[in-house]
Each structure stands twice: as structure tokens, then as C-alpha cells.
Amino acid sequence: KLESIGYLYEPLSEEYRRVIDFSDMKNLRSMFNKITIHVSDKCIQVNKGYLSDFVTSLIRLSDSDINTYDSFDITYIDPRRHITWNNILSILNEK
């Protein structure tokens, strides 16, 4: 679950709302003032496709240790030339 790696995730399939980075459960509870999840023994399934790619990207980003790099080479991405980025942006900007 994204909650276990520090993200609150609201499904993209129900109109994307937000992805919020939080470092501990106290921050999340003070923000929403409610219990975050109901724990059950059922298996969680993520639909394949664009949503799965987005979640995989978030997981890879959280697994990478950004602080270990001294400097980054900035790469500019033109969504018109990269179909993957174009698809992600179309999902995020869909109303």
C-alpha cells in the first residue's frame, strides 16, 4: 500500500484528487482528523494499465534515495515526443 511508504493516495479512476507526502501518521491524522485506513485480510488488487504505471512510478520514487546524489542533470521532457509522459499527463489533467 502506498500508505506504508509515506503517501496518501486517492484513486485516479475516481477523478484524481491528490497525492500527499507525509512522514508519519500524526501528520496525516492532524490533516484529516480521522482514521486513515481499515485493515482487512483481503488481498488488494491494482488494475493494470495507466494507474498501475503511475503507482509503480511512485513506489520507485520512494525507494530511491534522492539525498545521496550531489547534483542532478536536468532532463527536459517533451510530452509530445514521449508517449508515456503524454499518457500520464492526460490522466492527471482529465476533468
Swiss-Prot record:
Recorded GO CC terms: host cell cytoplasm; virion component
Main location: virion
Record flagged with keyword Metal-binding: no
Keywords, sorted A to Z: Host cytoplasm, Late protein, Virion
Compartment(s) where it occurs, according to its Swiss-Prot or TrEMBL record: Virion; Host cytoplasm
Induction line: Expressed in the late phase of the viral replicative cycle.
Biological function: Late protein which is a part of a large complex required for early virion morphogenesis. This complex participates in the formation of virosomes and the incorporation of virosomal contents into nascent immature virions. J1 protein is required for DNA packaging during immature virions (IV) formation.
Subunit structure: Homodimer. Part of a complex composed of A30, G7, F10 kinase, A15, D2, D3, and J1. Interacts with A45.
Family classification: Belongs to the chordopoxvirinae J1 family.
Name listed for the protein in its UniProt record: Protein J1 homolog
Species in which this protein is naturally found: Swinepox virus (strain Kasza)
Taxonomic placement: Viruses, Varidnaviria, Bamfordvirae, Nucleocytoviricota, Pokkesviricetes
